Amino acid sequence: MWKNGAMRGCNKETGEFLGPSRSQQRRTALEVLVLSEKLAALTPAQLAKLPIPERLLPHITETKRITSHIARKRQLAFLAKQMRREDDTTLETIREKLDASGIQAQREVATLHRTEQWRKRLLEEGDSALTELLNQYPQADCGKLRQLLRNTKTEQARNKPPQAFRELYQVLHGLIITQNSDNQH
């Protein structure tokens, strides 16, 4: 019997099939298995941000604990079975939140890459890259950036610890994050 109370079969009056086909059931089961694998890969802090029912959390924790390949595969299948018992809206909500957090992580990585690219360009190209940066980020402090660039080049020439190099990264990262948050609002 299905969740909606109907049995698989054919309606004698209309000839329509009741309930999902076996292929559809398999596809749904595989989707839930993939979701269970994603949940098992998350940290406890990431799991806490998701709307996961309390009765699933021990199963997820147990899956994370198991390291043996076959035992882990079996536990993932059990977790997926427990998840299939949940209603579709709960699973869909978990999927949406998980996708949203994945998109946010991609944005953060892109911001880190953009920051690193700007730092590299500023050190290699000098004033032309600084002018372009100031055009793109008018709120930037030109004097501080020039000073950090000079100090970074001096550090590199003398093989000193990269203190100004790191500070330059932090300043650029702050600029990019400020610009991104201004654009989103």
Curated annotation (Swiss-Prot):
The protein's name: Dual-action ribosomal maturation protein DarP
Alphabetical GO biological process terms: assembly of large subunit precursor of preribosome
Region (Disordered): 1-22
Keyword check for Cytoplasm: yes
Organism name: Xylella fastidiosa (strain 9a5c)
Origin superkingdom: Bacteria
Subcellular location per the Swiss-Prot or TrEMBL entry: Cytoplasm
Family (UniProt): Belongs to the DarP family.
Residues spanning the membrane: none
Any one Gene Ontology molecular-function term assigned to this protein's record: rRNA binding
Gene that this sequence comes from: darP
UniProt keyword terms in alphabetical order: Cytoplasm, Ribosome biogenesis, RNA-binding, rRNA-binding
Keyword set includes rRNA-binding: yes
InterPro entries for the chain: DarP, DarP_sf
Main location per the UniProt record: cytoplasm
Protein's job: Member of a network of 50S ribosomal subunit biogenesis factors which assembles along the 30S-50S interface, preventing incorrect 23S rRNA structures from forming. Promotes peptidyl transferase center (PTC) maturation.
GO cellular component, one term: cytosol
